C-alpha cells in the first residue's frame, strides 16, 4: 500500500453490481486503512433499532429523545459490538481519531453521556463493522466493486440515510442510476 492509496477518512461507495447483501448500495466510512487491512462502518443501512433500545439493553436510563436516534448496521463483523462515529468532543475512554472532524468510540461512557444529552453534536451509532484483510480492499477496488471519495461530514451525519449512496457518488460527478450492474473492464 502506498501513501496515495490510503483510504482512511474516505467513503467507499458500492458499485451497482455489488450484490453482497451486506454492501448492496452501501456507503462505508473507512476508519482505518493500513498494510494489515481496513476497517469501516456502513453509514446508510439503518436497522429497526434505536439508541433507546441499545441503552435499555445496557441498563442505561434515557428519555424519549434517544428513540429518535437510529442504530445502523455497520457491517457484518462483530454485529454485537457498538461503534459511535462522532464529531470530536469529550474525552471518552476508547476513542480513535479518524480525521480532524471525526472520531470513532467504542466505550460505554459515550453512550451514557448521550443518554444525558451531554454527548457529541454529530453522531452515528452502529452495530458491527466492515473489515478487509491485507490487500483485500485494494483488490476489490481494482475489480470495480467500489468507488472512493473523500468523506463529507454533511453526508456522514446530516443527510437522510436513503440519500447517502447517490450523494456520495455525486461528489465524484457520478450518477449511479446510469451505471450498469454488469460493468467490467474494457
From Swiss-Prot:
Q: Which residues form the signal peptide?
A: none
Offer a single GO CC term for the protein: cytosol
Q: Which Pfam family is one of those matched by this entry? A: DUF179
- Give the similarity note: Belongs to the UPF0301 (AlgH) family.
In Swiss-Prot or TrEMBL terms, this protein is called UPF0301 protein Tgr7_2910
Amino acid at each position: 500500500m502506498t501513501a496515495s492509496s490510503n483510504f482512511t477518512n474516505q467513503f467507499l461507495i458500492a458499485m451497482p453490481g455489488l450484490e453482497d447483501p451486506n454492501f448492496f448500495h452501501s456507503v462505508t466510512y473507512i476508519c482505518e486503512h493500513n498494510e494489515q487491512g481496513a476497517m469501516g462502518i456502513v453509514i446508510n443501512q439503518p436497522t429497526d433499532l434505536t439508541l433507546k433500545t441499545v441503552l435499555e439493553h445496557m441498563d442505561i436510563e434515557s428519555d424519549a429523545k434517544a428513540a429518535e436516534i437510529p442504530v445502523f448496521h455497520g457491517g457484518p463483523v462483530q454485529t454485537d459490538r457498538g461503534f459511535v462515529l462522532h464529531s470530536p468532543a469529550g474525552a471518552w475512554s476508547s476513542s480513535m481519531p479518524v480525521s480532524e472532524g471525526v472520531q470513532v468510540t467504542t466505550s460505554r461512557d459515550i453512550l451514557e453521556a448521550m443518554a444525558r444529552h451531554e454527548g457529541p453534536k454529530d453522531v452515528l451509532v452502529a452495530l458491527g463493522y466492515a473489515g478487509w484483510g491485507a490487500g483485500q480492499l485494494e483488490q476489490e477496488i481494482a475489480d470495480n466493486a467500489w468507488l472512493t471519495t473523500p468523506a463529507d461530514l454533511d453526508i456522514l451525519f446530516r443527510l437522510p440515510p436513503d440519500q447517502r449512496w447517490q450523494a456520495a457518488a455525486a461528489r465524484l460527478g457520478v450518477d449511479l442510476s446510469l451505471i450498469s450492474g454488469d460493468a467490467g473492464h474494457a
